[in-house]
Amino acid sequence: MNNLQEQLIALGGVFQAAVLVDRIARTGQASEANIGCMLGSLLVRDPKDTLEVFGGDDLNLRDGYRALVGALERDPSSLQREPLRYALSMLGLERQLNKRGDMLDIIGNRLPQIQSQADHFGLVHENVIASSGALYQDTLSTLRQRIQVHGDMRFLQQASNASKIRALLLAGIRAARLWRQLGGHRWQLVFSRRKLLKELYGMMRTTD
């Protein structure tokens, strides 16, 4: 696996989180498997490669890849506007987080507690989701830049959905951090679109 593929997997994780946030906001539903994959990505330590962060299978990121392709192709018929907005916001928030060592320490200290809960209850248990959402609320949601989630108020006002959305945003920002650590830059999305798309098309063939 080359470095660009590693970057695209991490970026696919950002977009996967964005797609799931949009899905919950609009319909109140997202599969437990998809949510579990993203929550699990918060807890992976010392992965052998980037794909292992997301369960070791490209299929787990299929929806994220599709949204990323739609953004890079700039085709109005395939562009998922809200997921793109959420993804770009997560990339921006990660840059702010990187300047906040105190906030990184809080996140680093509380993730082992969430790991213990996940070991006891399972990844998608309401306690694990609530703790992950609370960690986002106590840290990233206090930054100047905020992510405004749009959708159906019937679903957004449900506490369980709000926790899922916050937990997914935390996971997406973790993926954004990984992307940047692998050498990813926002200008690539503008100036290296063709190169990224060529690599993505090949990666997506294994998920269809």
From Swiss-Prot:
A Gene Ontology term for the protein's cellular component: cytoplasm
InterPro entries attached to this UniProt entry: HflD (IPR007451), HflD-like_sf (IPR035932)
Gene3D superfamilies: HflD-like
Topological category with respect to the lipid bilayer: Peripheral membrane protein
Highest taxon in the source lineage: Bacteria
Localization per record: Cytoplasm; Cell inner membrane
Protein's UniProt keywords contain Heme: no
Short name of one Pfam family: DUF489
Keywords: Cell inner membrane, Cell membrane, Cytoplasm, Membrane
HAMAP family per the UniProt record, alphabetical: HflD_protein
Record family assignment: Belongs to the HflD family.
Protein name: High frequency lysogenization protein HflD homolog
Native source organism of the sequence: Pseudomonas entomophila (strain L48)
